[in-house]
Amino acid sequence: MAFTSLLGSDAERKVAVAEVALRAVLCGLGALAAALVATDTQTRTFFSLQKKATYTDMKAMVLLVAAAAAAAGYSLLQAARCCCCVALLRTSIRPRARLLLAWCVFACDQALAYALLAAVVAALQASVVAKQGLPQLQWMAICALYGAFCRQAGAGVACAVAAAVDAALLAFLSAFNLFRLYGAKATTTT
């Protein structure tokens, strides 16, 4: 059974377009989140002593920048792969090679979604502590002192949340692309 006959060529094209679009959005959101957080800095003067706040002061933000940048780079590479594979699908690709590629994409998409989600959750937790403080440990809310820093970091975290949602949608789509190949195999054997 041909790959295109399982969904039909029009439905397959729509799935491929959706995948490329989701990967492009993830690339943009990941790059934007990484850029917003990585370039975030604010300097304040306290009694003639200058204190500078940067994203490296919070290790969760460093993790977020790394995860968002990795997501942007990975999604750019995968978008290029999608464009190349659409051209290759018109030719004959062995089913075993197609299945191996689908498994690799599925595993990488799952790992990316979980890693990005973990980084976003850690950054959100650190942001809540920065915004509200932690009176039990006598940690003050630093957003009262570094307002511009917190606003830009908040915008970066918001972009990262949207990127994590996009990565989860891509994980679902790659699972669909993988398991529909097993559906085609099951229908040919019966």
From Swiss-Prot:
Residues 38-59, 122-152 are extracellular. It is a multi-pass membrane protein. Keywords: Cell membrane, Membrane, Transmembrane, Transmembrane helix. The keyword Transmembrane applies. Residues 1-16, 81-100, 174-190 are cytoplasmic. It is found in: Cell membrane. The chain crosses the membrane at residues 17-37, 60-80, 101-121, 153-173. Homodimer and heterodimers. Belongs to the Casparian strip membrane proteins (CASP) family. NCBIfam families: A_tha_TIGR01569 (TIGR01569). This is CASP-like protein 2U1. It comes from Zea mays.
